[in-house]
Amino acid sequence: MFPDSSYLFSMRSLSRFLIAIFGCGALLASCDSFERSVLPFDKTDELVVITVNSPDTYYENAEGSYAGLDYDLATEFAKELGMKVRFKTVPRLDKAWSLLEKHKGHFAAGMNISAKHSRHVAFGPIYQLVQPQLAYNTDYNKPKNLHQLGGRTIRIAKGVTHAEQLNKAKHEVPELKWKEMDLTPDELLARLAEGKVDYVVADSTQINLAKNFYPNLNAAFNLGDSVGRAWAFSPFAEQALLEATQKFFTRIQQDGTLTRLLDRYYGHIERLHHTDVNGILAKRRTILPELREHFYEAEELSGIDWRLIAALAYQESHWDALATSPSNVRGIMMLTEITADRMKVTDRLDARQSILAGARYFALLKDKLPTRIKEPDRTWMALAAYNQGPSHLEDARILAQKMGLSPDAWVDLKKTLPLLSQSEHFRTLRHGFARGGQAVVLAESVRIYYEILQKYEPPYSWGFPIVARKEDDSWQEF
């Protein structure tokens, strides 16, 4: 869950941050001879950000662009300041702390607040709460507490704050053992899934992300209290930078930007059960090879990543070309008769016809959305429209506007789509009742299946859309 705004921006947090501002300013005044590694904030147009290269903060996505919560936050911050942004990526957190201490960047992003580091750095406002947890391999018995580890060694990534929680726990569990490793939490969790280490302590977000790729991973129990995540600044950070940071986080919390970004990266990660993950991983080896060429062709036809089309097909039918619902929705893409006719499908149970038609229809739904709706929200809304139709999606957008929410933000439509099944809402809308909750489930599930396929399946590396839409009647308005 996301942190409560009253916690994130409490007066206590603000007071601590303002103390840090004036403390750092005083320290800077007494350190004129300090040799800087980055230009002063007020003497440069480039913001230098230190961050770890990981799916939790900063990474290269399937399109070859950079993404991640802290990438988006830092980019938005630089844009607000009218500055360029440059990222210094490191493989592990200990390297990030080291670079920060040497003032190699203006701040380090995605850092967990800890008592140890608070003595040496200033932390900005908390923008996310994470829960340290003990992860275990579900092929073995689940420990209920630290006493049940049987003398086995816990692994943690070097530079993380979890050593502080473990040191506290050792007072009650003297036999507790752990080892810091020159690996990222993601790499440690992969080793845990492979049975190469006994236990791993990591943040809840990291474990939940990893569970979608390694279904034999799970959290056994929480370790201590939740921890705030924030940007960390060296003692030599300028007062103007610290004040600008406070102003920025206050703004994005108040206008909903922070909520939307947290939902973009974490709002869907706990949707699937481990059996769902096991299912797609197994069928990826047995069924997907027979369908892969059809999905490649669908990407050429629609311009949509074949792995997204395959994820949608898996959610709809588990890649069963003969799937049929009680309402006569049929085929691998579960097309209605009306949609099949519109897409000129002669046999809905023909896998190739169904996949190509489903991809074209999905692309058409995306094209019909207002151009102001940006990715990735545009894709998630198109998925919802694929499930319940564009008219009901538009009703949900209208309802969002009536409720003071954004009709262009997926995080807000996740709230209004389920309301389409409630009479107090749907009787006020043009298109009436809809099972909008189903659309949310479909879109959120496809998001995870897509991430799984992105991890294990390479992109289709050649070819461009080969069908001219104007020459194909099935691309016309509907």
UniProtKB/Swiss-Prot annotation:
<keyword id="KW-0961">Cell wall biogenesis/degradation</keyword>
<dbReference type="InterPro" id="IPR008258">
    <property type="entry name" value="Transglycosylase_SLT_dom_1"/>
</dbReference>
<dbReference type="GO" id="GO:0071555">
    <property type="term" value="P:cell wall organization"/>
</dbReference>
<dbReference type="InterPro" id="IPR000189">
    <property type="entry name" value="Transglyc_AS"/>
</dbReference>
<dbReference type="Pfam" id="PF00497">
    <property type="entry name" value="SBP_bac_3"/>
</dbReference>
<feature type="region of interest" description="Non-LT domain">
    <location>
        <begin position="30"/>
        <end position="269"/>
    </location>
</feature>
<keyword id="KW-0732">Signal</keyword>
<comment type="similarity">
    <text>In the N-terminal section; belongs to the bacterial solute-binding protein 3 family.</text>
</comment>
<dbReference type="GO" id="GO:0009279">
    <property type="term" value="C:cell outer membrane"/>
</dbReference>
<comment type="similarity">
    <text>In the C-terminal section; belongs to the transglycosylase Slt family.</text>
</comment>
<dbReference type="InterPro" id="IPR001638">
    <property type="entry name" value="Solute-binding_3/MltF_N"/>
</dbReference>
<dbReference type="GO" id="GO:0008933">
    <property type="term" value="F:peptidoglycan lytic transglycosylase activity"/>
</dbReference>
<protein>
    <recommendedName>
        <fullName>Membrane-bound lytic murein transglycosylase F</fullName>
        <ecNumber>4.2.2.n1</ecNumber>
    </recommendedName>
</protein>
<keyword id="KW-0472">Membrane</keyword>
<feature type="signal peptide">
    <location>
        <begin position="1"/>
        <end position="29"/>
    </location>
</feature>
<comment type="function">
    <text>Murein-degrading enzyme that degrades murein glycan strands and insoluble, high-molecular weight murein sacculi, with the concomitant formation of a 1,6-anhydromuramoyl product. Lytic transglycosylases (LTs) play an integral role in the metabolism of the peptidoglycan (PG) sacculus. Their lytic action creates space within the PG sacculus to allow for its expansion as well as for the insertion of various structures such as secretion systems and flagella.</text>
</comment>
<feature type="active site">
    <location>
        <position position="316"/>
    </location>
</feature>
<dbReference type="GO" id="GO:0016998">
    <property type="term" value="P:cell wall macromolecule catabolic process"/>
</dbReference>
<dbReference type="InterPro" id="IPR023346">
    <property type="entry name" value="Lysozyme-like_dom_sf"/>
</dbReference>
<feature type="region of interest" description="LT domain">
    <location>
        <begin position="271"/>
        <end position="478"/>
    </location>
</feature>
<dbReference type="GO" id="GO:0009253">
    <property type="term" value="P:peptidoglycan catabolic process"/>
</dbReference>
<keyword id="KW-0998">Cell outer membrane</keyword>
<dbReference type="InterPro" id="IPR023703">
    <property type="entry name" value="MltF"/>
</dbReference>
<dbReference type="Pfam" id="PF01464">
    <property type="entry name" value="SLT"/>
</dbReference>
<keyword id="KW-0456">Lyase</keyword>
